[in-house]
From Swiss-Prot:
Naturally occurring in which organism (per UniProt): Homo sapiens
Regions of compositional bias (Gly residues) in chain numbering: 34-44
Domain notes: The cytoplasmic domain may be involved in the regulation of trafficking and proteolytic processing. Regulation of the proteolytic processing involves initial intracellular domain dimerization. ERBB receptor binding is elicited entirely by the EGF-like domain.
Family: Belongs to the neuregulin family.
Protein name as annotated: Pro-neuregulin-3, membrane-bound isoform
Lineage, highest ranks first: Eukaryota, Metazoa, Chordata, Craniata, Vertebrata
Extracellular side: 1-360
Region (Disordered) residue spans: 28-48, 119-223, 246-280, 451-481
Polar residues biased stretches: 149-163
Post-translational modification comment from the UniProt entry: Proteolytic cleavage close to the plasma membrane on the external face leads to the release of the soluble growth factor form. Extensive glycosylation precedes the proteolytic cleavage. Isoform 3 is glycosylated.
Length: 720
């Protein structure tokens, strides 16, 4: 079914399912890697990924990058603006060049003028001119003889109109100029113009009209524009006169003329195939320098001169290169001169002056040089900062085990049995009384719960113990008493009664605690008492040896005085134990029904194998107590004693041992910080909870006294 469903599913669904499966597998792998697999807290579990945090070095690197990029970007923008400014200064000031031959003919003051005759014929153009001429009388020659005529002196004011060139078919003939109106002045005789005809010129000229009777006919003049020599409307110059060649002065018939001024048109004239035109060297104008008062007429260092003509004198200016106009007041772009003669200019003429150009080039060069220097400094600073950042990152990678605490350390150390350092936690809690007794009989029980720092040695008596990590009482006691004691899993810590006091420090040990007198009903004798020896790794060694006890019974209860030798000694003091006699003042017997608060010594890794050999009454029994962590065996010889007395002695020994251990552990804890330790002590007094260090060490006597005073104050506060 599943295979069929898979086959029936579309490919998109299959791919989606495969993708989801892959994602699930990846997520499971990631979770296993993060948690260390199923055994997340095991020894071989992988460490959780370190939390990513924003490093200051990374941020600083980014800031340095932007600090270097932004000035470079601004510098390039400034460079572009500088180049644009240079282009605007150099190219923007140069006007666009327009050739003069493409300018409209009606424009004013745009074409340059020439004060000398051209060296070549003008271009073939037909020009219509309006002239005012004075003709001299001519005498016609008879019989076809050639006649000569005097040159005409013509003063013209010209306006040129450009037309398309006109050519005669079949031969080279210059374009003719036909005067539209001719006025004869001071004519003494009828003015006649001989017309020479030739077979070659049999056709009439364009625009010619038949002669009107009574009007003089003018000779056909060479057809080249006179306006080419005087095109400026402001220039009043005389046009050059010319004479016809002898080939053109052939005999012609003339018509009658009248003395009145009439409009004439040139007749059809014939001439040989080849003809030439000669210019006259005579001129009617005179060039004179301007007077001193007229020197300011020409601007921009132009040269002023006066032209005298028949109509009067006229002032003109010869402008310097780069200027034009009537008074040289118009600036001519220098591109004209560059285009006309580019070999004489090297590009510096684009500027108004060479100094300005040099200043601008210098300023732009300084800007570019400054930008390059700033870029170099930024690059050097960037690489230096990058190197320093790498060094800082390498220093940060050095492990700092003393400053970091791992959350996984406690679980890992709890499961590893070979680790020396471990966290020992002291848990205090109160237990409700089983039977209604007085306040003096209330007990506080506490237990050490913590990881074992050392391997355990199997004990044959482990099966009879109720709790694994606690020692059992001596097997000498009765089953009723043992059942009343072994139901607890922690030792009892009894607050001192109003009559109980802590004695002063006698040597390195505490004095015996005083127990209040409580009447007891009956006693049950028992054999032997346990004697224990603490391991040498802890900061205290306890040797307990009891002397033979004398049993005394009374009607009200059991009262006895015993001498007990107890020594509590720091390991750094001496290696051999010594004993101090302690006077047992008041020992109180407990009944089997009220023996529910007998403390059990904690086993902070302490397991002992006790082999007891009970003997007969009045005979000493030998008990061999072997430490589970040391191979030495303590041989203790004790007499046959009462079980109640043994219980009382054991209670006292255990109380002193626990108090000494608590004092030393608390002292080691407070050595790091006294103030913090005092706060923790108050919290432990109120909440019955305290945390002990990994491996406690012995401290100085001054610290021990300080801790002792705090303990006394706390006990007195609890008693009140």
């Amino acid at each position: 079914m599943s295979e069929g469903a898979a086959a029936a599913s579309p490919p998109g669904a299959a791919s989606a399912a495969a993708a989801s499966a892959e994602e699930g597998t990846a997520a499971a792998a990631a979770a296993a890697a993060a948690g260390g697999g199923p055994d997340g807290g095991g020894e071989g579990a992988a460490e959780p990924p370190r939390e990513l945090r924003c490093s200051d070095c990374i941020v600083w690197n980014r800031q340095q990058t932007w600090l270097c990029v932004v000035p470079l970007f601004i510098g390039f923008i400034g460079l572009g603006l500088s180049l644009m400014l240079l282009k605007w200064i150099v190219v923007g000031s140069v006007k666009e060049y327009v050739p003069t031959d493409l300018v409209d003919s009606k424009g004013m003051g745009q074409d340059p003028f020439f004060l000398s005759k051209p060296s070549s014929f003008p271009k073939a153009m037909e020009t219509t001119t309006t002239t005012t001429s004075t003709t001299s009388p001519a005498t016609p020659s008879a019989g076809g003889a050639a006649s000569s005529r005097t040159p005409n002196r013509i003063s013209t004011r010209l306006t040129t109109i450009t037309r398309a060139p006109t050519r005669f078919p079949g031969h080279r003939v210059p374009i003719r100029a036909s005067p539209r109106s001719t006025t004869a002045r001071n004519t003494a005789a009828p003015a006649t113009v001989p017309s020479t005809t030739a077979p070659f010129f049999s056709s009439s000229t364009l625009g010619s009209r038949p002669p009107v009777p009574g009007t003089p006919s003018t000779q056909a003049m060479p057809s080249w524009p006179t306006a080419a020599y005087a095109t400026s409307s402001y220039l009043h110059d005389s046009t050059p006169s010319w004479t016809l060649s002898p080939f053109q002065d052939a005999a012609s018939s003339s018509s009658s003329s009248s003395s009145s001024a009439t409009t004439t048109t040139p007749e059809t004239s014939t001439s040989p195939k080849f003809h030439t035109t000669t210019y006259s060297t005579e001129r009617s104008e005179h060039f004179k320098p301007c007077r001193d008062k007229d020197l300011a007429y020409c601007l921009n260092d132009g040269e002023c001169f006066v032209i005298e003509t028949l109509t009067g004198s006229h002032k003109h200016c010869r402008c310097k290169e780069g200027y034009q106009g009537v008074r040289c007041d118009q600036f001519l772009p220098k591109t004209d001169s560059i285009l006309s003669d580019p070999t004489d200019h090297l590009g510096i003429e684009f500027m108004e002056s060479e100094e300005v150009y040099q200043r601008q080039v210098l300023s732009i060069s300084c800007i570019i040089f400054g930008i390059v220097i700033v870029g170099m400094f930024c690059a050097a600073f960037y690489f230096k900062s990058k190197k320093q950042a790498k060094q800082i990152q390498e220093q940060l990678k050095v492990p700092q085990n003393g400053k970091s605490y791992s959350l996984k350390a406690s679980s890992t150390m709890a499961k590893s049995e070979n680790l020396v350092k471990s966290h020992v936690q002291l848990q205090n809690y109160s237990k409700v009384e089983r039977h209604p007794v007085t306040a003096l009989e209330k007990m506080m029980e506490s237990s050490f719960v913590g990881p074992q720092s050392f391997p355990e040695v199997p004990s044959p008596d482990r099966g009879s113990q109720s709790v694994k990590h606690h020692r059992s009482l001596s097997s000498c006691c009765s089953p009723g008493q043992r059942s009343g004691m072994l139901h607890r899993n922690a030792f009892r810590r009894t607050p001192p009664s109003p009559r109980s006091r802590l004695g002063g420090i006698v040597g390195p040990a505490y004095q015996q605690l005083e127990e209040s007198r409580i009447p007891d009903q009956d006693t049950i004798p028992c054999q032997g008492i346990e004697v224990r020896k603490t391991i040498s790794h802890l900061p205290i060694q306890l040797w307990c040896v009891e002397r033979p006890l004398d049993l005394k019974y009374s009607s009200s209860g059991l009262k006895t005085q015993r001498n007990t030798s107890i020594n509590m000694q720091l390991p750094s003091r001496e290696t051999n134990p010594y004993f101090n006699s302690l006077e047992q003042k008041d020992l109180v017997g407990y009944s089997s029904t009220r023996a529910s608060s007998v403390p059990i010594i904690p086993s902070v890794g302490l397991e002992e194998t006790c082999l007891q050999m009970p003997g007969i009454s009045e005979v000493k029994s030998i008990k061999w107590c072997k430490n589970s962590y040391s191979a030495d065996v303590v041989n203790v010889s004790i007499p046959v004693s009462d079980c109640l007395i043994a219980e009382q002695q054991e209670v006292k020994i255990l109380l002193e041992t626990v108090q000494e251990q608590i004092r030393i552990l608390t002292d080691a804890r407070r050595s790091e910080d006294y103030e913090l330790a005092s706060v923790e002590t108050e919290d432990s007094a109120s909440e019955n909870t305290a945390f002990l260090p990994l491996s406690p060490t012995a401290k100085s006597e001054r610290e021990a006294q300080f801790v002792l005073r705090n303990e006394i104050q706390r006990d007195s506060a609890l008693t009140k």
